[in-house]
Curated annotation (Swiss-Prot):
Signal peptide: none annotated. Monomer. Binds 30S ribosomal subunits, but not 50S ribosomal subunits or 70S ribosomes. This is Ribosome-binding factor A. GO terms for biological process: maturation of SSU-rRNA. One of several proteins that assist in the late maturation steps of the functional core of the 30S ribosomal subunit. Associates with free 30S ribosomal subunits (but not with 30S subunits that are part of 70S ribosomes or polysomes). Required for efficient processing of 16S rRNA. May interact with the 5'-terminal helix region of 16S rRNA. Belongs to the RbfA family. NCBIfam families: rbfA (TIGR00082). SUPFAM superfamilies: Ribosome-binding factor A, RbfA. Pfam families: RBFA. One of its GO terms (molecular function) is ribosomal small subunit binding. GO terms for cellular component: cytosol. The keyword Lipid metabolism does not apply.
Amino acid sequence: MANHFRVDRVGMEIKREVNEILQKKVRDPRVQGVTITDVQMLGDLSMAKVYYTIMSDLASDNQKAQLGLEKATGTIKRELGHNLKMYKIPDLTFVKDQSIEYGNKIDQMLRDLDK
């Protein structure tokens, strides 16, 4: 049970650090406006699935952001290594967070019911 709390704590710390690294260290214009919404860790802390959103709804911007994040993965891992006190920094996988779009769709459906 205690391991579960550690996994959650490490995930929250990685989320905070990756957001900061994207704002201050990564200069790639493709990742401007990207916000990390969640990080899910494997139980052994070897892999982190990083969920992100981008302000634009355009598919081309989403694809550019994904490519920019994949390109910046090495820089992000290196900075995490400097900032976190962990034996091994987990491998990072970036995934577009669909929950906000889903929430907006549900919101629109509810508004349409009121009409």
